[in-house]
Amino acid sequence: MKRSILAAVTGLVVWVLVASLLDRGLRLGLAGYAAAEPTLSFTLGMKLARLILGAFASLAAGATAAAIARSSPRVPWVVGVILLVAFVPGHLRIWAKFPVWYHLVFLTTLVPLVAFGAALLSRRAATAKPA
């Protein structure tokens, strides 16, 4: 139980850290992104970059949670659901600032991407075991 809680909390922290680092990269590397961020007036390319950022953060969170939880395959799913519950209110607040497809892509892929990150780690671990 303690290991599952640690795995879930760490997965959530990893999501925030990865997203923050990648967002910093977007600010530094994508022309106009830093200026567009305060008003959320992103171009299509910027919106796609933000969705990709979220996907990488979700994959990392799932892999981290799975690595720590090991024998509890439900933990990454719990992490994904917690993230979804945390993000829905924020997306409702900014609903008018983004097209519907943006919100739907982010919210509907959040839980599956966390689970997929966990599955990728499990698959990699299974193939790395000596025969």
Question: Where is each model-derived feature located?
Answer:
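Juxtamembrane/disordered regions of integral membrane proteins
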Residues: M1-A131
